[in-house]
Amino acid sequence: MGLQCSDVDLGVYQEYITGTLRGYDRISQLVGPSLPVKYPRTPGHRPSPDESTLNGWYWKCDIKGADDGKLSGKTIGIKDSVAVAGVPMMNGSKLLEGYVPEFDATVVSRILDAGGRLLGKTNCEDLCCCFSSFTNVTGPTLNPHDRTRSSGGSSSGSAALVFTGEIDMAIGGDQGGSIRIPASWCGIVGLKPTFGLVPYTGACFIEVTLDHLGPMARNVHDCALLLEVISGPDGNNDSRQSSSFHVPEYTKQLQTEMTGKKIALITEGFACCEQNVQDVVKETALKLTIKGALVEGVSIPLHKDGNAICSAIGLEGAYNCLYKGNAF
């Protein structure tokens, strides 16, 4: 490097570095804090092929939450990119096989506090980096309508298991479509919430400006109900959130009159869709119009570059979070 150091300088630097290394040694001896785990649980088991015919499950367990709450009587699956204390978590990848979190993600704690019952971890794509359903190291997750086809990804298991009725609801994750795509392909309701509405604390990051957790269910009401439970500030644990904000009762808003509501359809969004998908969206828009809403096409030219922009952000973010960091 072209540096010239005298023996005296080297001695000073060596003494300085030695002190720094002692600090690292001390840190390695410290016992890290452990978060309390509120509800009794056992580790569960890896399901046999007969227990997971679509390969939708990564791990089966049975964790009962509070005796009463908004989710009382509801069964829920958690995408395997989200931590559940004491339950193995692989995130679809051989890299994490054998890892067992010691904490519950915030959304998991909220579900249990609301009386939900967790039945297991749902399979997802390898590090959540695929929109289809064939990259999980345990094998592909099959589409419940046609087992020769993909269930979509990366929240593949969540969508497939919700459709079959093995669970009432599921938590999915979405960066560039990972809730919406499998929900569409399996025929359920999936929502990517407003950025920062649902805390991401305790889930594997890909890119902090793209990461979302959201609800998946067989109908809009249950999707809204789960969103009510998991939304809200997380005590500054998620830096993307405001310190305080109001969470509406979304289930009550389902009864809101549509008269006077303004809804925009992005015209560029239809350019890459198959015709039958376009038809379904337009039929839905017509139903909203009949209910009194004003539905209009709106042009956002930059939307055409959305895939390119999202891919670049996602790849660089994934490199920083997954390869340079520890994904948490």
Region annotations inferred by a language model:
Residues 105-109, 220-224, 316:
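A structural signal for well-ordered alpha-helical segments within the folded catalytic domains
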Residues 127-128, 178-179, 305:
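Generic structural signal for helix capping and beta-alpha/helix-loop junctions
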Residues 4-175, 291:
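Gly/Ser-rich catalytic/binding loops embedded in alpha/beta enzyme cores
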Residues 143-155, 196-203, 319-328:
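Short, basic, helix/turn surface patches
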Residues 2-71, 229-328:
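Amidase signature
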Residues 22, 26, 32, 132, ...:
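Fold-level recognition of mixed alpha/beta catalytic cores in primary-metabolism enzymes, strongest
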